[in-house]
Amino acid sequence: MNRRLDNERVIRAPHGSDISAKSWLTEAPLRMLMNNLDPDVAEKPSELIVYGGIGRAARDWDSFDRIVASLRKLEADQTLVVQSGKPVGIFRTHPDAPRVLIANSNIVPHWATLDHFNALDRMGLMMYGQMTAGSWIYIGSQGIVQGTYETFVEVGRRHYHGDLAGKWILTAGLGGMGGAQPLAATMAGASMLAVECQPSRIEMRLRTGYLDRQAASLDEALALMAEAAVTKQAVSVGLLGNAAEIFPELVRRGVRPDIVTDQTSAHDPINGYLPKGWTLAEWEMKRASDPKAVEQASKTSMVGHVQAMLDFHAMGIPTLDYGNNIRQMAKDMGLANAFDFPGFVPAYIRPLFCRGIGPFRWAALSGDPEDIYKTDAKVKELLPDNKHLHNWLDMARQRIKFQGLPARICWVGLGDRHRLGLAFNEMVARGEVKAPIVIGRDHLDSGSVASPNRETEAMKDGSDAVSDWPLLNALLNCASGATWVSLHHGGGVGIGYSQHAGMVIVADGTPDAARRLERVLWNDPATGVMRHADAGYEDAIACADVNGLDLPSLAR
């Protein structure tokens, strides 16, 4: 019996103001857990897989049921402890403590290998939580679309005089994260050719409005890119195929995209990357019968994929790793110069992290889109001079279809997050929205992750692999009163390559919530400024000074 498979279940978060838990502070994690498994949100909900290879919301269906039952009976001064997707304890704490504490996929460093994780996973002792899958704050592809948009805009600013009209981006991967790329590209004014090996993923991105159309062949896809370059009308095109075959073929043909990147699930060479020349059926069968053969074939295929990206880079085309660890996989197989093209964080995003700016997100627990539109307006009211952000919110309302509970992603930083959280809480208190608002973020944030091949690649002081920072972030968020806090390993780049922390806090309209929101939404981004200031980044040191952060080691 497969305890992780149930084809009969359809999970959706409840909507409205009636709750089945004892308070909104426990109803919120309950709804967000269920929302992660909504068929409009999750990649494989019948297997509890939300996104990112095998990123799960719960370890198995029995654990899911026990989590739900535990949340429904949890008292206002109790905390539920969840170990890799299984509820293991309920303890008396206090009303300002987190209602849920989550640890996912954490392994003692010497044993933190994919092989050892897979053995524990098969034994039913662990699950892979990715970043927001096992921490119950995934909001569909919107969760990464603004970060991807900001990256593409910055590439355009640096390399194309700030104008991506008539330019096109080559990428691969249309899963839960990669599926944001086509919409982010067209929002930024560029066209995109996205290669994807699974038809269901192309269909989902077409259905949810993230992808404009599908090409029947590579020739048709290239013709559409050429036409868009002339008309300067941005279009996103999905192509069914294998990136390990398509990328090298484009190099052979002498095709020159304007930007090259990749968001296949290369971090998981067994479950996330189709080997060159294999069918989906063969891949699925061999994942169960001979996973080591799949891993070897996948990583061998990645060498050709990365070599093609290196070839584009050598042509002078802006080429960037988008954080899936594909360079490391290729280097492991002998491609010595795999890291010759940069990751997106050190190349384009780190200046934002130095100011504590990152992927702030919120969801309307009512299920009513109007609640999100009202919060959009509140963001504009409180940040009247941020025209770039206003433009983003306008585009998001027009072009992003909600998946599951209505939600919004909005990159803001220290000094603004707590103001927005307090304003949302006041809206709940005054009845301007129909139910509380849940506020969280990706683990990909300025102070909550250690990932030497992604968020902390090429740190100024060489502290790329120091993982004290996400641990301190999680501890501080617990002390500050976040509603649930998570500490994960392996998200984004795979087992052995990252540690990261998440937090979620509920704005339920009460004065107690206001006090928690003010603490959490100040301290959380402040840890990012602290981390980068400690590494010697002048922008972060200046931000700390302006905001009055007390950083003893940097006292002047």
Curated annotation (Swiss-Prot):
Binding annotation for NAD(+): 52-53, 130, 176-178, 196, 201, 242-243, 263-267, 273-274, 322, 492
InterPro entries hit by this protein: Urocanase, Urocanase-like, Urocanase_C, Urocanase_central_sf, Urocanase_CS, Urocanase_N, Urocanase_Rossmann-like, Urocanase_sf
Keyword vocabulary terms for this entry: Cytoplasm, Histidine metabolism, Lyase, NAD
Record-linked Pfam families: Urocanase (PF01175), Urocanase_C (PF17392), Urocanase_N (PF17391)
Gene3D superfamilies reported in the protein's UniProt record: Urocanase like domains, Urocanase superfamily
Active-site residues, record numbering mapped to chain: C410
Pathway(s) where this gene product acts: Amino-acid degradation; L-histidine degradation into L-glutamate; N-formimidoyl-L-glutamate from L-histidine: step 2/3
Entry GO CC: cytoplasm
Cofactor field: NAD(+)
Role played: Catalyzes the conversion of urocanate to 4-imidazolone-5-propionate.
Keyword check for Iron: no
Enzyme class: lyase
Co-factor: note: Binds 1 NAD(+) per subunit.
Keyword DNA-binding in annotation: no
Family listed: Belongs to the urocanase family.
GO MF annotation, one: urocanate hydratase activity
PANTHER family in alphabetical order: UROCANATE HYDRATASE
Domain of life: Bacteria
Name used for this protein in its record: Urocanate hydratase
